[in-house]
Amino acid sequence: MEGKLFIFSAPSGSGKTTVVQHLLNTDPRIGFSISACTREMRESKEANGKDYYFLSVDEFERRIQNNEFVEWEEVYPGRYYGTLRSEVQRIWDMGKHVIFDVDVKGGLSLKEQFGDKALSVFVKVPSIEELQKRLIDRNTESEDSLKARLEKMKYESSFQDQFDVILVNDRLEETFVKAHQLIDHFLENNSK
């Protein structure tokens, strides 16, 4: 089966990962695309092949040369993230549609690759003030980090109109319902 793809992208703190996890836990038709990266694994919190495929820089670059990635990006020097073609195929081989939780750049790249087979969704917070509150409530950001994330959010938000749908995450339960409706509608109208 060559299924459909659901691309969820957003600035940090938008609730994108929470929405994607909810969809994965409640919709058996979809499977999660695990990204590959070159950063160090957080030993106590992450597992290779579950959270990410952790690759060395040399291995990642070799796979780039072999055209094994659907999309990839060097986010910092020597720090790569990407989506392996084999990962998309793995999910399709299970008879499922693929869901992605990726940054804005990756989301646009995936949409460009897959075109009408993919629905790209930009998850948006109602306001910058709300995003700032969410990031502060996480209690994981220094003041400089918070400032940098807010600047990045403004930049990433400038691309929101390039996505098929903008999903405003104001009330989480309502956002879950809307996300399910988006998937159902896309599958019903793109069943070819």
UniProtKB/Swiss-Prot annotation:
CDD domains associated with the record: GMPK (cd00071)
Keywords assigned by UniProt, alphabetized: ATP-binding, Cytoplasm, Kinase, Nucleotide-binding, Transferase
Record's catalysed reaction(s): GMP + ATP = GDP + ADP
GO cellular component: cytosol
NCBIfam families: guanyl_kin
Identification of the protein by name: Guanylate kinase
InterPro entries named among the record's database cross-references: GK/Ca_channel_bsu (IPR008145), Guanylate_kin-like_dom (IPR008144), Guanylate_kinase (IPR017665), P-loop_NTPase (IPR027417)
Protein location: Cytoplasm
Molecular function terms, GO-annotated: ATP binding; guanylate kinase activity
Listed SUPFAM superfamilies: P-loop containing nucleoside triphosphate hydrolases
Species of origin: Cytophaga hutchinsonii (strain ATCC 33406 / DSM 1761 / CIP 103989 / NBRC 15051 / NCIMB 9469 / D465)
Broad class of the protein's primary localization: cytoplasm
The protein's role, per its UniProt record: Essential for recycling GMP and indirectly, cGMP.
Top-rank taxon, per record: Bacteria
Similarity field: Belongs to the guanylate kinase family.
Cell membrane in keyword set: no
Signal peptide location: none
Pfam families documented for this protein: Guanylate_kin
EC number: 2.7.4.8
Keyword ATP-binding tagged: yes
Residues of the Guanylate kinase-like domain: 3-184
Binding site for ATP: 10-17
